[in-house]
A protein has these predicted regions:
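Bacterial N-terminal signal peptides
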Residues: 4-14
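Sec-dependent signal peptide cleavage junction
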Residues: 13-23
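Active-site mouth of glycoside hydrolases
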Residues: 27-250
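Membrane-proximal envelope and lipid/glycan-remodeling enzymes
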Residues: 36-52, 96, 286-288, 307, ...
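Extracellular glycoside hydrolase catalytic/binding regions
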Residues: 55, 167-342, 363
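Substrate-binding cleft of secreted/luminal carbohydrate-active enzymes
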Residues: 293-407
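Intrinsically disordered, low-complexity coil/linker segments enriched for acidic/polar
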Residues: 412-419
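Short, solvent-exposed mixed-charge patches
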Residues: 429-430
Length: 430
């Protein structure tokens, strides 16, 4: 221990490095490759009191399996309405994620997720808390949370105008900022914490909203920068149809970026081979050009392979026709590596099964243990084939070593990677 601190003193005295990672530092590091994982309490709808319980030791066992598969990253999904439902259980689970990730050498991005806006608007949906809807007749209960639903369009339009307030008159943006700060305060001092995603796949309904999203992302980024120097991720929008009337283009997507781009990543989803046909290639090229415009690296926060079929005016996921083969996985991940993306996360890891087979990396029956499906094997083999065995695999540290790493980072003189390198070298010296 004395040797470690002697090394630290020498290092600190010879450096004036700040604590932020630049874009070049982000892209020069070994890539992160992993999974999108759903939790238990953090994924509950606000009125959910009947979901099947998670397996015993779900987080711990999952992270061990993920690490054993040669993966080094988890994009961990949570929902704001689950926090409003039970803040204590929510934060307890978030902390358990950070502790287990430290143990197994995984890097976590904590993802503020929404799907179809909120369960207030749609039974299947999860996302925004009910306090933002209650008492406002404009957002009728069950009014629909998808992009084509009028109630959802009203909500998102008001959200970008920053006119949404709860019954007590509290501003929605400020409330989300305070919520995200609770996550940061709970896990930021963990070596496993890579960063935070502001809001997954926000809705865009007209051409005038692109710049407003940029103002929102700038506000949240500025607020979080008061308490963290770790990576902040902002997300692509939905719908992402190239033919939609919202005028999707690299120029407009670039308007979503926060004004402070230090240590920022841009999350996009890829659910087909990027160069599989003209449409998919054009779509992926649009993301690459957006990254070039902003100087912000691409983070493929979701990837898989699906088939969509037309139902009226919209295309919907077809679970029966969707499949992921070894060839598909190699083509997708190969294209992503060639593009030099910052990291990837496969959709998805969850103890609750869904109809699309390839969305299930593990299976679970009550009373049994988590069991890997063939898709975990495909993912493991593909990552090893494309990136090499255990590329970017992170060392594990015990509690004492993690505490030291965190203390070194808090000095403001060492980045997290530098602190880890110092501690690792001291361990090797003995």
């Amino acid at each position: 221990m004395i040797l470690i601190f002697l090394l630290v003193i020498v290092f600190i005295s010879s450096t004036s490095l700040g604590s932020y990672a630049s874009t070049s530092e982000l892209t020069s590091k070994p890539p992160i490759n992993g999974v999108v994982m759903k939790g238990a309490f953090v994924s509950m709808k606000q009125d959910d009191y009947g979901s099947p319980p998670a397996p015993e030791n779900y987080i711990e066992d999952s992270f061990k399996m993920i690490s054993d598969a040669g993966l080094n990253h988890v994009r961990f999904v949570f929902y704001w309405e689950a926090y409003e439902r039970d803040p204590e259980a929510f934060i307890k689970e978030i902390k358990s994620v950070a502790n287990a990730a430290d143990k197994y050498g995984l890097k976590i991005i904590y993802d503020n997720h929404q799907w179809h806006t909120s369960s207030w608007l749609e039974e299947r949906a999860t996302g925004f808390p009910w306090s933002l809807f209650e008492g406002n007749s404009k957002y009728s209960r069950g009014g629909g949370g998808n992009t084509l639903d009028e109630t959802a369009q009203d909500f998102w339009g008001d959200w970008w105008d920053r006119s949404i307030k709860d019954k007590e008159g509290k501003d929605g943006w400020a409330q989300m900022s305070e919520f995200l700060k609770q996550i940061v305060l709970a896990v930021d001092n963990h070596s496993s914490t890579l960063g935070y995603e502001i809001l997954s796949e926000p809705h865009v309904h007209n051409k005038g909203q692109w710049s407003k999203i940029g103002k929102f992302n700038s506000f949240i980024t500025e607020e979080l920068r008061d308490i963290t120097s770790k990576t902040i991720v902002y997300s692509m929008n939905v719908p992402i149809d190239l033919n939609s009337p919202i005028n999707i283009s690299p120029k407009n997507l670039a308007k979503m970026a926060p004004s402070n781009k230090e240590n920022i990543a841009f999350k996009v989803s890829v659910y087909a081979v990027p160069n599989g046909d003209g449409y998919q290639e054009k779509r992926f090229d649009m993301f690459l050009e957006t990254s070039d415009r902003t100087g912000v690296p691409l983070y493929i926060g979701e990837w898989n392979n699906v088939v969509r079929t037309k139902e009226g005016v919209i295309s919907k996921l077809n679970p029966e026709l969707s499949e992921l083969t070894k060839s598909d996985a190699k083509q997708i991940l190969g294209a992503l590596k060639k593009a030099g993306v910052w990291g990837t996360a496969f959709w998805r890891w969850d103890y609750q099964e869904v109809a699309t087979d390839s969305f299930n990396l593990v299976s679970y029956n009550n009373g049994s243990n988590l069991k890997p499906t063939k898709y975990l094997g495909i993912l493991e083999d593909t990552v090893e084939t494309i990136y090499g065995p255990a590329v970017g695999k992170l060392p594990s540290y015990n509690a004492k070593e993690n505490n030291l790493i965190n203390a070194l980072v808090k000095t403001g003189k060492l980045t997290e990677d530098e602190a880890k390198e110092l501690v690792t070298k001291s361990m090797q010296i003995g």
